[in-house]
Amino acid sequence: MPDTPKADIPSDNAALEAQGIASELIDDSAARIAELEAKNADLADAYLRAKAEADNIRRRADDDIAKSRKFAVESFAESLLPVKDSLEAAIVSHAAGKGSPEQVIEGVHATLRQLGQALERNKVLEVNPPAGTKFDPHQHQAISVVPAEQEANTVVAVLQKGYLIADRVLRPALVTVAAAK
């Protein structure tokens, strides 16, 4: 055998050392993989819990909205019940022959006031523009245009009152409007 320098021949110790380092790297990698898998499982669990909580919140909000819609009219209806009671009492009284026509008229006026108060409590406002008010197509509906001694495009007369609720038109006021001269 020719003489070869000892540096060129791998020693058994070097091979064992390299094998040990590789084994350590594999062990470290396996530990890191196990750690990351555990962290991944924790994050997946946290995600599922957060998603379930969000779904529950969304479902509760939808239920609340449905209940609000269902019972939104409750307060309004409750304020109208005394008006209904008054009208029924008037019918019973009239059927029994009680009360003069003046008393009936007085009762109708009282019931109308009661209805007005119920509407006001529920923020239903009348649209009853006085003559000469500028025509507003958002709150008024022109039924006819008539010649008049007032400025053009102004209200001459109200044929039927309109109503607003929370700045939204429930029904426009039916009006006649002054024609251009």
Swiss-Prot record:
SUPFAM superfamilies: Coiled-coil domain of nucleotide exchange factor GrpE, Head domain of nucleotide exchange factor GrpE. The keyword Chaperone applies. GO terms for cellular component: cytosol. Keywords: Chaperone, Cytoplasm, Stress response. Its main location: cytoplasm. GO terms for molecular function: adenyl-nucleotide exchange factor activity; protein homodimerization activity; protein-folding chaperone binding; unfolded protein binding. It is found in: Cytoplasm. GO terms for biological process: protein folding. The keyword tRNA processing does not apply. Belongs to the GrpE family. Participates actively in the response to hyperosmotic and heat shock by preventing the aggregation of stress-denatured proteins, in association with DnaK and GrpE. It is the nucleotide exchange factor for DnaK and may function as a thermosensor. Unfolded proteins bind initially to DnaJ; upon interaction with the DnaJ-bound protein, DnaK hydrolyzes its bound ATP, resulting in the formation of a stable complex. GrpE releases ADP from DnaK; ATP binding to DnaK triggers the release of the substrate protein, thus completing the reaction cycle. Homodimer. This is Protein GrpE.
